[in-house]
Amino acid sequence: MEDFLRQLKDAAYDLSPLDIIPNHLYLTNVFFFENDTPDRDSPFMPHEALVASLYDSLQSFPILVGCLQPGVTTTKLVVDADNPNLPSWETHNVPDVHFGRVKTRGFHRESWPECINITDPLVHAEDGAASPKLLRVRVCRFAGNSGVAVVVRLAHCVFDAKGCTFFLNYWATCCRNRLKPGSTEAATPSPPILDRSVMYACLPPSVRPKPLGWLLLPLSLVLTTLVRVVMFFVGKKTSTGTSRALLFCVPRRTLDEVTKHDGQDKKSRLSDNDVVTALFTMAYAQMRQAASNGKMPRKVTAIVPCDFRHRLGVPQNFTGSCAVGLYVTAPLALLLQHITPSSLSEVAAISRRSVDEVDIKVIERFSKRAMLAIQLLGDKARDLYSLMVCQAFSNQSRLPFYDVDFGFGRPLFVSPMAYSKSLAVIVPPPPPSRDVYVYLTLEVEAMAHMLRNEGFMAMVKRVY
């Protein structure tokens, strides 16, 4: 830590509108590592190596020791070298839970120690601190030195999901290098790009942030006040309500069966993501139809993120939010059909067309919309998103969560935790499986209705 503090300098990072909208949330993941070495006396994944390598990695990620500094319609992350916002670190020893027991139960959430069972997605300061931690780490050590679970919570305003895995693998590489100093196996990870101006350089000038003109300031104040009033009366409908989260597996056979019914041009085949989007959107629409006593709009919209790094040439090591939310809209009559491979294929085709149509103009349009919302409402713009009655998705299925190796082997199981309700997070399965996992968070009653949907349940398996 001392080396990190010596080289730390004051800095300020202007967040983009894409960062500001989710700035009230953490990205949370838990990693399960098994100690399968014969020598059970040596500490597995020793505390000193994990902490020291974390601070090694922070030399390239000083943004993580910054403090949120909101303006009227802007937000910055400010690093104070004399008073950094250092990560929180907790260690829990669990003498009554053996890693083997959790593994035998397929990492079912009911088998987890209570210390890693986190449900709150919100960023907030604790213990009277002036600013919330941007990075929280919690380590659970199982009985008999049998394994370790590592929970990492990263503020969403700092990273998107891709930036999150970039940081996690960077930290893991630093740990491996520290364990074998001078080894030919030592790797030099590519440095991250934290400056949001790198993303703006790939976007049209019209999309780049502009200061709010003084003529618009009164309008901004009025709109912000109106949003506060609306949220006061309908707060129970927002992302902070009572929710339940389950992890589903969409088997490979289900995915393949749906794509067999695909009648589209073979140049644009349905992806796994299209099928998953269709499946959970149909189930969500059917749940909403039952809850609304038939009072539903003729069309239902799902929000599907589209990472535009590769489309616009934004460097892959850019770690800030770099995705726009596409609106995939399908007729209600189609969504209310019984869920079968054939009906799923029809809805999935709509998702595929929406993604295929993404180009610079689409990205520019959505970015401008986010920019205007932030200009006028600041971080209150997120409240408007929380009021949307639609299924939202986060596609993380291709991200290298299972490559995170601190020098003691890769994780046997990785799971997201603590997400907002009405969000379906698509994540990779444990290797070598080719299934797709989906972590779904809904209101308690809504989830109960989903579980009673026979068509939906025929297409999935519950992991927990």
Q: Where are the language model's segments positioned?
A:
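Divalent metal-binding acidic/histidine catalytic loops
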Residues: 311-318, 330
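Helical lid/core segments from catalytic subdomains that handle acyl or acyl-like groups
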Residues: 321-404
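Flexible, P/S/T/G-rich "lid" or insertion loops adjacent to the active sites of thioester-utilizing
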Residues: 205-268
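Non-catalytic N-terminal regions of enzymes
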Residues: 1-210, 242, 256-263, 270-293, ...
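Short acidic alpha-helical/loop segments enriched in Asp/Glu that coordinate divalent cations
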Residues: 290-302, 360-371
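Active-site rim elements
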Residues: 37, 41, 266, 334-341
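Short, compositionally biased low-complexity segments
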Residues: 18-28, 223-236, 317-327
